[in-house]
Amino acid sequence: MKGLRLPESMREELAKPHGKLYRGKGEKLLLEVEEISEAKPFCTVGDLVTASAIKVGLTPDLAVADGKTLREENVEFEQEAFDEVIETTNPPAHISCELISALLKALKLCEDGKKVLVFVDGEEDLAVVPLVKLLPLGALILYGQPGEGVVALKVDEEKKVLILNLLNKMEIIGECDELKYLLGGD
């Protein structure tokens, strides 16, 4: 598997919320996230956040999910809410070249007005990292903060610089064109 591996030393830094934390539980919490209305595109990472968004009528332009929450229980949501489903693989604590490729394909489809689900065999948690780098300024990523609520991460120049610094600290476990693009291209 080619891509990036998260070193143990970075796990604590990436576990912190990197956006505005909305505390609470349940679908109604998403209705409090005022950033959704102005975000283009609006993205979710994680099954519970994606399922909750769909339930309250806020189907994301791009969702990344793996069918599980906290790596255990299955979470079901309406895949029919999406125009396209792209399947990919990504091991825990990695950003695989396959995941980067799937995200790039999904973003092209989103540009054409399609709603896209990237379904990951493995783990989707770290998808937030490449998404910040790949999404345009003004995009919004919602992801779960275990035991606390939902994080609304608005993509801006500051976040892009932060993420590029984090990406460059990760361990390269095999190069691919998508990885070169992620680390250096814009």
From Swiss-Prot:
It catalyses: 3'-dephospho-CoA + GTP = GDP + CoA + H(+). InterPro entries: GTP-dep_dephospho-CoA_kin. Keywords: Coenzyme A biosynthesis, GTP-binding, Kinase, Nucleotide-binding, Transferase. GO terms for molecular function: GTP binding; kinase activity. GO terms for biological process: coenzyme A biosynthetic process. Its EC number is 2.7.1.237. Pathway: Cofactor biosynthesis; coenzyme A biosynthesis. Catalyzes the GTP-dependent phosphorylation of the 3'-hydroxyl group of dephosphocoenzyme A to form coenzyme A (CoA). Belongs to the GTP-dependent DPCK family. PANTHER family: GTP-DEPENDENT DEPHOSPHO-COA KINASE, UPF0218 PROTEIN TK1697. This is GTP-dependent dephospho-CoA kinase. It comes from Archaeoglobus fulgidus (strain ATCC 49558 / DSM 4304 / JCM 9628 / NBRC 100126 / VC-16).
